[in-house]
Amino acid sequence: MLRDPRAYLWDAREAADAILGFVAGVDLDSYASTPLLHSAVERKFEIIGEALGQLSKVDPSLAQRIPDMRDIIAFRNVLIHGYAGIQHRRVWDIAQSSLPGLRTIVAELLEGLGG
């Protein structure tokens, strides 16, 4: 049974909030040299990609309102299947540049659905 679209948006928002909290006040060198930190960030990105991938199955029209949806899901797949080649700088850059905007959009969609 498929979940309510709000549940997927909630999962994505919560994972984004966690990442933003994890990297607050941390520089790239500290991030890259702290396995616990980059493991946690990568896991939360996996959750975002999976949640939004499931959202695209449950409510494709809602999912289309999220820019770069394909890239988000593809990034999740890289983290899951290409784990040996993950570049900390790439993950860091996405967390710093793309994630805040994604978090805003997901929160707005969730709010619009009464969540």
Regions from the PLM with identified roles:
Residues 1-115:
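Solvent-exposed interaction patches of small proteins and small membrane subunits
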